[in-house]
Amino acid sequence: MNHVIASPPVDAEPTYHADFAMGEHSARHLRRILRLYLKGWELLDVADAAELALTELIANVVRYVPGRRCQTFIFLLAAGGVRVEVADACPDVPRMVVGDELDEGGRGLVLVDAVTDKWGVEPRPDGRGKTVWFECLSVAGAADRAIALSDRSAAPRAPRP
């Protein structure tokens, strides 16, 4: 299971932040915004997974949060990936439920768990509601980091005086 509690660094600033009431078509607009950021960051390898996970979190807001109001944050991870957070004032914590194969809903967090590297739910710092978040890490970014680290360790070092 990918469910982990891991807050971003306190000093991390989101690249994108929106605060508004969600409608039936809000997920489509947020997916488009997310994809634009991922394209600019050269992280398109995580776009499909991140968009699906975002859609599921927004669907939960539309379905379960009174007033459908939430805040959405997008963070670029230094490790080469993206973190998306959806915060709302509803105290009810979503649960991952494996339903009957004929059920029409209830699989959102199962999908989030399947397509993300990490996800979790944590109480909001102000005590009102919760934040549901996920992280998708780029395989390409990880490979590039590994090559850079191996290049650094293989590089000749100047003798110390």
Regions found by a protein language model. Name each.
Residues 22, 38, 42-45, 62, ...:
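Short coil/turn residues that cap or connect secondary-structure elements
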Residues 28-55:
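Conserved short strand/loop->alpha-helix "switch" segment adjacent to the catalytic nucleotide/phosphoryl-transfer site
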Residues 1-17, 62-161:
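Conserved beta-strand-loop-beta-strand hairpin that lines the nucleotide-binding pocket
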Residues 17-29:
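STAS-typified acidic loop motif
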